[in-house]
From Swiss-Prot:
It comes from Ectopseudomonas mendocina (strain ymp). Monomer. Its main location: cytoplasm. InterPro entries: Elp3/MiaA/NifB-like_rSAM, Methylthiotransferase, Methylthiotransferase_CS, Methylthiotransferase_N, Methylthiotransferase_N_sf, MiaB_methiolase, rSAM, rSAM_horseshoe. Residues 378-442 form the TRAM domain. It catalyses: N(6)-dimethylallyladenosine(37) in tRNA + (sulfur carrier)-SH + AH2 + 2 S-adenosyl-L-methionine = 2-methylsulfanyl-N(6)-dimethylallyladenosine(37) in tRNA + (sulfur carrier)-H + 5'-deoxyadenosine + L-methionine + A + S-adenosyl-L-homocysteine + 2 H(+). Binds 2 [4Fe-4S] clusters. One cluster is coordinated with 3 cysteines and an exchangeable S-adenosyl-L-methionine. Residues 3-120 form the MTTase N-terminal domain. The gene is miaB. This is tRNA-2-methylthio-N(6)-dimethylallyladenosine synthase. [4Fe-4S] cluster 1 binds at C12, C49, C83. Its cofactor is [4Fe-4S] cluster. Residues 143-375 form the Radical SAM core domain.
Length: 447
């Protein structure tokens, strides 16, 4: 009988990438096939996020729901990975003693032997070490699920922003060798992938060894990826303003495959708060980078992350954040109320802003950025957009959907599955709050 794997992923795109590689790994080494139903699974894995307190609470709530499955099937293996696993380690079993395997982002390649050991010894297996970049040497060739794929180019972060747990849960920055990244992308394009998203906690900090002993920076990596056969679009995330260099800006102007969309987190528009966060740049320096980028690529859209209610944030600080939003005109944001994370420097700061004030500020910020995003979408009405068709529409099986280079989901009436994985031109007829609708112009050239 075929053994089944159920995997649930919380958090960032790095976690999504890691989960996909776990599927590849366990498919090759243990012949596990993915199921969408945890009650069918022989192995259940939870890939976790610890960026906010609610995300961490969600982990133990989910584990609690799986406890009955373990009681009904003692041979079921339950594993917890990701940043909560890295942060909590064996302590996870204090609250969920039925967990069999605890592994960190850098040790997921050891899953097959950890699962085997848990089964044979009937004892929990815990490995949350940081063996640098070893995991990539132990992972099989990636499988493909559609025309787009994530590729991790580096791990960890060395910025140590005062609010962030990433350096403690994923380690410091370690870059994959240039040739390794290019090999993985070539393996993907050979299987039909046309768009890659390069991933890292701070991709701008990429410093990968080259075959001739040099160190390639991120701009060089972008040019090298663009030179590969079959690559028609390149995205990347996440970036840090401090290392968003002139060379990267030039790459945006020079590389046609680079999309006209950039996620460049700023977190706050207040220099005082930015200093308290240890972001090591000012709001003016951030705006200067954006101005230079827009001079090179006038129609590029910018998104960001924002933290509202950081300890000590005053009304003036928030007004400065809103001023930055007005000046830049962000298209989208991941924005949240500050969540204190144990072990970070900011956890020791006095948080004296009332919760209601934080909620009000967040609502104001999100409303304004949503306005900018919708304005950008409405400007696309009447234009022709080149989209990469990814799948059928989730809400209407009579429609296909894809994404523009400016990161807009477009739905259009068509039931021809041959278009999935292809680039097509779509006339944009209408802008909705979270997507566009259009009309397919000509699919006669699609084979």
């Amino acid at each position: 009988m075929t053994k089944k794997l159920y995997i649930e992923t919380h958090g960032c795109q790095m976690n999504e990438y890691d989960s996909s590689r776990m599927v590849d790994l366990l498919g090759e080494h243990q012949a596990l096939e993915v199921t969408e139903k945890p009650e069918e699974a022989d192995v259940i894995l939870l890939n976790t996020c610890s960026i906010r307190e609610k995300a961490q609470d969600k982990v133990f709530s989910q584990l609690g729901r799986w406890r009955e499955l373990k009681q009904a099937n003692p041979d079921l293996v339950i594993g917890v990975g990701g940043c909560v696993a890295s942060q909590e380690g064996a302590a996870i079993r204090d609250r969920a003693p039925y967990v069999d395997v605890v592994f960190g982002p850098q040790t997921l390649h050891r899953l097959p032997e950890m699962i085997d050991a848990a089964r044979t010894t009937k004892t929990a297996q815990v490995d949350i070490s940081f063996p640098e970049i070893e995991k990539f040497d132990r992972l099989p060739e990636p499988r493909v699920d559609g025309p787009s794929a994530f590729v991790s180019v580096m791990e960890g972060c060395s910025k140590y922003c005062t609010f962030c747990v990433v350096p403690y849960t994923r380690g410091e920055e370690v870059s994959r060798p240039l040739a390794d990244v290019l090999l993985e992308i070539t393996q993907l394009t050979d299987k039909g992938v046309k768009e890659v998203t390069l991933l890292g906690q701070n991709v701008n900090g990429y410093r990968g060894a080259t075959p001739d002993g040099r160190i390639a920076d991120f701009a060089e990596l972008l040019h090298a990826v663009a030179a590969l056969d079959g690559i028609e679009r390149i995205r990347y995330t996440t970036s840090h303003p401090l290392e968003f260099s002139d060379a990267i800006i030039a790459a945006h102007a020079e590389i046609p495959q680079l999309v006209k969309y950039l996620h460049l987190p700023v977190q706050s528009g207040s220099d005082r708060i930015l200093a308290a966060m240890k972001r090591n740049h000012t709001a003016l320096e951030y705006k200067s980078r954006i101005r230079k980028l827009r001079a090179a690529v006038p129609d590029i859209l910018i998104s960001s992350d924002f933290i509202v209610g950081f300890p000590g944030e005053t009304e003036k600080d928030f007004e400065q954040t809103m001023k930055l939003i007005e000046d830049v005109g962000f298209d989208f944001s991941f924005s949240f109320i500050y969540s204190s994370r144990p072990g970070t420097p900011a956890a020791d700061l006095v948080d004296d802003t009332p919760d209601e004030v934080k909620k009000q500020r967040l609502a104001i910020l999100q409303h304004r950025i949503n306005q900018y995003g919708f304005e950008n979408s409405r400007r696309m009405v009447g234009t022709v957009q080149r989209i990469l068709v990814s799948d059928y529409s989730k809400k209407d099986p009579g429609m296909l959907q894809g994404r523009t280079e400016q990161n807009r989901i477009v739905n259009f009436r068509c039931d021809n599955p041959r278009l999935i994985g292809q680039f097509v031109d779509v006339h944009i007829d209408d802008a909705l709050p979270h997507s566009l609708r259009g009309t397919l112009l000509d699919a006669s050239t699609v084979n």
